[in-house]
């Protein structure tokens, strides 16, 4: 069994102390940059990298792990804390089907991406969480 050990925490643009604005492209770029820092700059092999996402970050994290798996270089594990099935599903749940589909793209279909991930997956989700439905 491979021992996984690497954890890199980052804020997405427009969240926390990070500058910039949050949009799909900036979040995807930050996710890709975080994986590159871990693997290329710090020398962490993908087979020892744990990809972690919390709340809004679970979609980009699942997409990154699916992309790595597609390239036959999956991470060691994927951990999703308070995930959602997709941003569009969340918007539909909160705003209704017509408005949700109109306003929100299907950029991070977490549930669909999980089917493509080829590493162990840990889902952490409270059964009373009314914000992030999974």
Locate predicted features.
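Hydrophobic/aromatic beta-strand patches that form the interior of the parallel beta-sheet core
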Residues: 8, 79, 122-124
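Conserved alpha/beta-hydrolase
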Residues: 4-19
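Short beta-strand/loop motif that positions the catalytic acidic residue
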Residues: 116-117, 122-129
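Alpha/beta-hydrolase active-site loop
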Residues: 21-43, 63, 112
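Active-site nucleophile elbow and catalytic-triad environment of alpha/beta-hydrolase enzymes
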Residues: 99-119
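Conserved alpha/beta-hydrolase "acid-adjacent" motif
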Residues: 130-134
